[in-house]
Amino acid sequence: MWLSTSPYRKGSQCGEAFSQIPGHNLNKKTPPGVKPPESHVCGEVGVGYPSTERHIRDRLGRKPCEYQECRQKAYTCKPCGNAFRFHHSFHIHERPHSGENLYEC
């Protein structure tokens, strides 16, 4: 038997109680009397997780990963020059160059 350790949550619009629904799925609107999230960078209202990181990154002009080793593309296709970060992507790409038949009739 599964027991919930968290208290029941109430929907902000309907008032129903839920025991196994995450808070972000209850109701999408902010309940009355509760201030919506605000960006600490620009002051824009309504910025909430999971878009918070992306919003702040956009406002500050940062890229998702600023480390060179994260952006490095280690696998380069010799016939066409395309580069790939992952071996699996490279392997799929090089199949047509090798003349390998992917599917049998």
From Swiss-Prot:
Presence of keyword Signal: no
| Keywords assigned by UniProt, alphabetized | Metal-binding, Zinc, Zinc-finger
Q: What is the organism field in this record?
A: Homo sapiens
Which stretches does the record call C2H2-type zinc fingers? 75-97
Full protein name: Putative zinc finger protein 861
> What terms describe the molecular function in GO for this protein?
DNA-binding transcription factor activity; zinc ion binding
- Does the UniProt entry include the keyword Zinc-finger? yes
Segments traversing the membrane: none
Source species, domain of life = Eukaryota
Q: Write down the InterPro entries for this protein, in alphabetical order.
A: Znf_C2H2_sf, Znf_C2H2_type
